[in-house]
Amino acid sequence: MTINRRHFISASAGITAAMSAPMVFGASRPQVVIIGGGAGGATAARYIAKDSKGAIDVTLVEPTRSYYTCFFSNLYLGGFKDFDSIGHTYGKLANDYGINVVHDWAVDVDSNGKTVALAGGGSLSYDK
C-alpha cells in the first residue's frame, strides 16, 4: 500500500484519537513516532504534542537540521526576502512542545514489532 496524503491524515487522526484515550495497561506515556519533518510531519508532531498536553511522547525523525518551506518562497524568488528567511529549524518543536527530534534516516518500519529502525543503528518504539 502506498502512503498518500489522505492515508497519512486519516492515520494521524486515528493515532491521535487512540492515544487520547486513557491507557489501560502500563504507566508510561504512549509513544508516537512521526517520520519526516516537512510541513505535514512537523505540523502533525506539533499538534499531537500540544493537544495531548504532554500525555503523549512524540518523536520526529528527520535527517536534516533545517527545513526550507515552499510557503512564501515566491517572496525569495522575487527578491523581497533572503533565503534564510524561509528556513526553519526544529528547535522550537523541541523547546516549546517537548518533541524529541531525531536527526537520522528511518530505514525500516516493523509494524508487528512496532519499531522504526534508523540508519545510524538505533531504533525507536511506538504504540500505535
Walk through the language-model features, giving the residues of each.
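N-terminal secretory signal peptides and thylakoid transit peptides that target proteins
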Residues: 1-19
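SH3/SH3-like beta-barrel fold
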Residues: 116-118
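Beta1-alpha1 glycine-rich phosphate/pyrophosphate-binding loop at the start
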Residues: 27-100
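Core beta-strand elements of the Rossmann-like FAD/NAD(P) dinucleotide-binding domain
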Residues: 122-128
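A conserved short coil-to-beta-strand element within the FAD-binding core of flavoproteins
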Residues: 104-113
